[in-house]
Amino acid sequence: MFENQPKGLWALALANTGERFGYYTMLAVFLLYLQANFGFETGLASTIYSTFLMMVYFLPIIGGIAADKFGFGRMVTTGIFIMFIGYLVLSLPLGKDTVAIAAMGISLILIALGTGLFKGNLQVMVGRLYDEPQYASNRDSGFSLFYMAINIGAMFAPTAAIKIMKWAQESLSVSVEDSYHFAFAVACASLIISIAIYYAFSFTYKHVLASETKGKDDKTPVKETNELSKAETKERIICLCLVFAVVIFFWMAFHQNGNTLTLFARDYTQKTSEGFQSMAFDVTNLVACIFVVYGCFGLAQSKTGKGKGISLGVIVAAIAFLFYKYSNLEGAVDVEAPIFQQFNPCYVVALTPVSVALFSWLHKIGKEPTSPEKIGLGMLVAALGFVWMAVGSMGLELPLTQGDPATEGTRVSANLLISTYLILTFAELLLSPIGISFVSKVAPPKYAGLMMGLWFGATAIGNQLVMIPGIMWGQNFNLIAIWGVLAGICLVSALFIFSIIKKLNRVS
């Protein structure tokens, strides 16, 4: 999994981890901040929140166009500094008046613009690391590792936001409203770490930027290693656009984690947990489980006795920690609806080595699915996740009929959502990192930035469509109908991918 990866991958992945940690720390409390600080009603706060998300995923298109003209490295650096200014403005406690609202709006625009310049272009740089022949066969596994790094940042972000806010309230005696700004300040600090890593280890990926630097300095066009004809370029762009169309519906379904799945957690899922199940709601226990997984892989792959010994020590220590936590459980723990969102990034981090190892083994025996086939399989698995939700929702009352008055005895087990997030994570691992890898591999070199930007543009459209199941929820649709629509969309998308699989495989 970790072998034969370019050194530049680790530098770019860690830089991205720092940026994503800051982004998700801000995002974890932003909606609550809008209501607590400005008193916005839920509809207005949600509109601001969703519009911001859409901007975050649409602006990489502009970032890609700019990078194709000015260079990826320059745009990544510019993006980090613009984001920093945005988070800095957001971290200032300016009050609740019109000036504060205007400042918040400006900060959101800066954060979205900076993300647009940074996010997609950094991934293009990762893709170019694998243009070298000795690394080409590890492109998919490399993007899986890069994607895992994103989720490491996301995994700890909500806890960081909550902890820093509580510390500010208890130690500094600041108000709840002002404590949100401390969470935004964490995002500023994370960007400082991110830019430090990006520059300190630039020697590991400087060859990726060498060609574009030469082109700018010498004022001579850089000849592409494999020039494409107009027909080949057109075919590749068409294939990518077909994949982008499918990606829209994946993110529409997947990002229900912050919409209908969270509503289901609030209205239909048990609010307390005890015994072994309750351990899943402590992120430190999930991290220990991740160490067990990685320790097992280290034990299997280490070629020296020292390496195997270290791996075994990690496994024993993690299991001992889990046993200690289990033996000291005291009664039931409260389960809040947002806590379920910690499972997805934890699953991604834990399952990435499993995914990489599985496909590496399939590659060795000549049975590995192609990138387009993996995308199609991802849509099928996503459909299965919502079929599972439909099965678990049988017999439950309609959303508006039940609302929030359900008693603990009539609520379903938390295991339904925990298992659903697991299924959706399998789908995500098949589609998201593989899809990004596919774009970096297939995109015509002179349109690489634009194509990566369009990937994020498709994600943005999917984010906007997330509201449709929410509208169905509010219109008193049956739960099975809501999950059925999502399952059906994923299934149709999968069938579409497999219907054009030969065309997609030809360009990949």
Where are these regions (language model features)?
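Intracellular loop-helix junctions on the cytosolic face of multi-pass helical membrane proteins
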Residues: 1-7, 132-140, 162-333, 355, ...
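Helix-loop boundary and gating motifs at the non-cytosolic
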Residues: 3-53, 251-264, 322-333
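Hydrophobic core of transmembrane alpha-helices in multi-pass small-molecule transporters
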Residues: 17, 86, 99-121, 398-430
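Central cavity-lining transmembrane alpha-helices of secondary-active solute carriers
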Residues: 50-68, 155, 342-359
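Glycine-rich segments within core transmembrane alpha-helices of 12-TM secondary carriers
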Residues: 56, 138-169, 186-194, 282-284, ...
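Hydrophobic alpha-helical transmembrane and interfacial-helix anchor sites in secondary transporters
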Residues: 66, 126, 164, 358, ...
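Cytoplasmic membrane-interface "Motif A"-like loop-to-helix N-cap segments
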Residues: 69-80, 137, 301-311, 361-380
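C-terminal ends and interior cores of transmembrane alpha-helices
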Residues: 79-99, 319-327, 377-406
